[in-house]
């Protein structure tokens, strides 16, 4: 079998042209999953660059941000899986609790129309005014995040810190997509590509499948607005919820 590849692509600067250029470079190196941990406040311009997310058999994932209620690009693109964050509390006995992280981004776009997959058939969705993010979530709170080795420039001392943010939850979801692609290839299927139609249309709208593949996050807040509190079914903080990876992978 072909070994997995992780390729780091760095844009020369944070300008829109450079970021779009980096995405197009990933397309040229594809197929695969593109994990994006950058974001800019959405605007009327966002639709003009959506064509960058048109690579064949490519899955695009982006962080929703770490500043509470907000809508940013590229997460707001209908072709991008917007990944929010949770706070995970766990013990050595295997028990855990999970709530929406207070820093997770998310909200209703002021510019992007409601995509076809965000329908009233999705539990908790209602009738969205426009594109609503996030789509899904994963552990992102730095206090419950991933221990990471860091070395200060000029120092030879390695320290361990607990890293977090939706820049942590997004690559975790990208890893799931990569595993799903490997499983699909073994089964003679095409790569997953844009995951939204399957996650929303074939999983979230089927009660038993949704319950087995996602943990629905029903508590936690990231602001003071009416939609800023997690609830049963879809919400802007955690989307459909966090994955039950084993079950989700067999459903993808």
Range-by-range predicted roles:
Residues 1-252:
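Subtilisin-like serine protease catalytic core
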């Amino acid at each position: 079998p072909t070994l997995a590849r992780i390729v780091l692509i760095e844009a020369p600067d944070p300008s829109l042209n450079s970021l779009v250029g980096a995405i197009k470079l990933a397309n040229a190196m594809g197929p695969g999953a593109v994990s994006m941990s950058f974001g800019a406040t959405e605007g009327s311009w966002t639709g003009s660059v959506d064509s960058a997310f048109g690579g064949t058999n490519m899955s695009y994932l982006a962080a929703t941000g770490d500043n509470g209620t907000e809508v940013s690009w590229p997460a707001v693109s209908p072709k991008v899986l917007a990944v929010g964050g949770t706070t995970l509390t766990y013990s050595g006995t295997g028990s855990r609790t999970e709530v929406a992280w207070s820093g997770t981004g998310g909200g209703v776009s002021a510019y992007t129309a409601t995509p076809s997959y965000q329908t009233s058939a999705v539990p908790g969705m209602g009738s969205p005014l426009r594109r609503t993010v996030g789509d899904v979530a994963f552990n992102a709170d730095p206090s419950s995040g991933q221990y990471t080795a860091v070395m200060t420039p000029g120092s030879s001392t390695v320290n361990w810190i607990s890293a977090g943010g939706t820049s942590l939850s997004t690559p975790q979801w990208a890893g799931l997509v990569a595993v799903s692609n490997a499983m699909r290839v073994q089964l003679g299927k095409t790569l997953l590509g844009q995951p939204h139609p399957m996650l929303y249309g074939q999983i979230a709208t089927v009660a038993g499948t949704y319950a087995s593949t996602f943990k629905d996050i029903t508590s936690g807040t990231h602001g003071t607005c009416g939609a800023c509190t997690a609830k049963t079914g879809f919400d802007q903080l955690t989307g459909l919820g966090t994955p039950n990876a084993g079950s989700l992978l067999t459903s993808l």
